[in-house]
Amino acid sequence: MRKFFTWLKVIAKVLPSLLHYYFFVVLKQIRHKEKYSINLRYQNFRLMVIKILNAFNVKIIVEGKNYLNELGEKGLYLANHVGGIDPLVLVAISEKPITFAAKKELGNKIVIREIKQLIDLILLDRENVMNQIHEIKTMVNTIKDPKGFNLGIFPEGTRNKQLDDKCLEFKAGSVKVGYMAKAKIVPITIWGTFRVLSKKHYLKEYPIFVKFDEPIAPNDYSDIPSAELAENIRQQVSKNLINIKEKDKLFIANQKISKKRIEYETSYKY
């Protein structure tokens, strides 16, 4: 029942803005993409994402955001995958335009189709090898284009529903794009997104922890086999999860015993 009222509150907060955004911004920018820069399309989308997350009382706690600010160039973002809103959280954090590679099946959803047009999502066909070759080239070109998007990939290939301290296997193919584009690779650890839309969890604030590790330069991984590099990144993210979960427990414990809004110095403020 609480979740039901939460959804009602969210709808009341953001539905008018969403409708206005869709009919007067999204459709216009999709139909005349050539008139709107990637940055403008992205920033409008990002603003709406932030409104939606705020409506759900999401609190994003970020560590290592300075690595994004200091990146200075395009990068490949590799993150573990624990919730359906993982991409939205990264969009909310990143002022720099970022798009994502996702499985083709998601393109059947109306919302995803619209987002694909807006921020140039790359949908991967896992069954067709020839299509995969074309899609890999698209991902490489996306990173190489100085005016284009950064690229986010979830190398586990699916959401990890086990929610333990170990990530699923990081597919070697996810890092090969970095080799081909000669791009810096940014390892990212995400935790807490699975609670936001779940019926099993009800919190006054939903903490989401995101940690950015130091980018890995092409010169530092060019001689490492892709499978080994993917495993190294997986181990680092798994290690981060152990520390993040301790912070998460503390946050939730404090939330249960305090009626006041909890603020952390490390909290990311929109």
Residue ranges and their predicted role:
Residues 20-29, 41-42, 55, 70-129:
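Catalytic core of membrane glycerolipid acyltransferases/transacylases, capturing the structured
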Residues 66-70, 202-203:
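A short beta-turn/loop motif at secondary-structure boundaries
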Residues 48, 86-89, 111, 173, ...:
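Hydrophobic alpha-helical segments typical of transmembrane helices
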Residues 4, 133-270:
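Non-catalytic C-terminal accessory region of glycerolipid acyltransferases
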Residues 58, 121, 182-183:
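Short glycine/serine/threonine/alanine-rich loop segments
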Residues 1-61, 114-115:
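A transmembrane-helix-recognition feature enriched in membrane-embedded lipid enzymes
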